[in-house]
């Protein structure tokens, strides 16, 4: 079953994400992973679009500062590189791989070309200006950047930090529920690569937790939602990571129960599903954001939302979850009732 995204979702629907309930610009932060294009060149390409000043701390830590939107960061996967440094792995590996021990740059270059991605972390950008992000993707592609599908080893992804229309728990939870309902359909549309599915970054929520959340009677207080989420998901490793927004709501509870997790508090969903298809000619990140539009369309339609919630819960109660049947039901619902 393959529903091509070419597209049941028209670009005009992206405008539904432009504003908050208070009629302010909604923003999305983007993190994109790739290889085969050095960070300084990447920063120069971004500067052509976003202006600003390039500041090179090291070859693997570069910033584009003072753009209209804030600062961009260009770096080797920071957590993995820090872990290697903390464990003194560069020196240990140097004893194994000989000459490379005398040339850290060569070693890191070799590592990043095979396993560790370069990453661009963008500041929050108004969704109405998202075309500039697509322009950067095009420049990266034309200059040789490689993405997820180039190699089985490349479990590279795109992370979208999507600002909800409000911080009200019911609004946020309604979108969270809608995502869980549509996730399998979105995975088909987004063509999530198997290398990413087996990587330790985008694990699914448990059936027990999904059943709890999808129940039409589940409309907890913000405090109860936080407690339930942390009880079931004491990890960043979720396809839709809610810990950043929970930290934004209550940083103390994160520090208390998850002191070892590195969490930057943000007033956003941290959506980690999409592949980084930066080397594919017809792909742009806005296509992934358009899929999120469907989540919001479902959340905003009370009748369809309630029907799909009940149907999904019924499917989950079955001994065997028929994924293809559910994907087809989602597709028909979207075509007939949401678009």
Model regions and ranges:
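Structured core elements
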Residues: 159-161, 270
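C-terminal accessory/tail domains of diverse enzymes
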Residues: 2-118, 125-135, 142, 166-167, ...
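Short His-Asn-centered micro-motif
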Residues: 123, 161-163
